[in-house]
From Swiss-Prot:
UniProt GO cellular component terms: cytoplasm; nucleus
InterPro entries: A-crystallin/Hsp20_dom, Alpha-crystallin/sHSP_animal, HSP20-like_chaperone
A GO biological-process term: response to heat
Organism phylogeny: Eukaryota, Metazoa, Ecdysozoa, Nematoda, Chromadorea
Protein known as: Heat shock protein Hsp-12.2
Name of the encoding gene: hsp-12.2
Presence of the UniProt keyword Oxidoreductase in the record: no
PROSITE patterns (UniProt xref): SHSP (PS01031)
Length: 110
């Protein structure tokens, strides 16, 4: 299993927020590339883990904060995607935009 580094935009750029009808996850599978877009606006790059295991893309996000003496508030997302057979797993890259969208892309095999 190999971990994929999550890069992030600097906070100096601003973009329109996602619209309500955009959904939480977008998956695009074209002849040229495979791409997943995931809304992770409540997580920092250090709280996001992206891995490839065989032909499976694994995404784990975890944010934990203590709110008071009575308990803990935590947010966690786990996603797994079967990569198409024609995806070159060595090209998987992830990027976190300032608006909170994690985009994971991979090229197709030639």
């Amino acid at each position: 299993m190999s971990a994929i580094e999550v890069t992030a935009d600097a906070a100096s750029t601003w973009d329109w927020p996602l619209q309500h009808n955009d959904g939480v996850v977008k998956v695009h599978n074209t002849k040229e590339k495979f791409e997943v877009g995931l809304d992770v606006q409540f997580f920092t790059p250090k709280e996001i883990e992206v891995k490839v295991s065989g032909q499976e893309l694994l995404i784990h996000c975890r944010h934990e904060t203590r709110s008071d003496n009575h308990g803990t508030v935590a947010r966690e997302i786990n996603r797994a995607y079967k990569l198409p057979d024609d995806v070159d797993v060595s090209t998987v890259k992830s990027h976190l935009a300032t608006r909170g969208v994690l985009t994971i892309t991979a090229s197709k095999k030639a």
